[in-house]
Amino acid sequence: MSKEEAIEVEGTVVEPLPNAMFRVKLENDHIVLAHISGKMRKYFIKILPGDKVTVELSPYDLSRGRITYRAK
């Protein structure tokens, strides 16, 4: 269990990177590096550039995150 709660923010996928990593532009115009969460990887949910996603950011490192949801 983490000591601090994750910060959830909305963003748009800018570019796909190798190993299921993505560059995501957040609503506040910051660019973060994000990877796909385990359940999204397990169920083969595809993420393409331009998709709206929900990203969880750790309060310790705000430049990296985990994509937890892809909006339709």
Curated annotation (Swiss-Prot):
Full protein name: Translation initiation factor IF-1
Native source species: Pelobacter propionicus (strain DSM 2379 / NBRC 103807 / OttBd1)
Transmembrane segments: none
Biological role: One of the essential components for the initiation of protein synthesis. Stabilizes the binding of IF-2 and IF-3 on the 30S subunit to which N-formylmethionyl-tRNA(fMet) subsequently binds. Helps modulate mRNA selection, yielding the 30S pre-initiation complex (PIC). Upon addition of the 50S ribosomal subunit IF-1, IF-2 and IF-3 are released leaving the mature 70S translation initiation complex.
Source organism superkingdom: Bacteria
Pfam families: eIF-1a (PF01176)
PROSITE patterns per UniProt: S1_IF1_TYPE
Keywords, in A-Z order: Cytoplasm, Initiation factor, Protein biosynthesis, RNA-binding, rRNA-binding
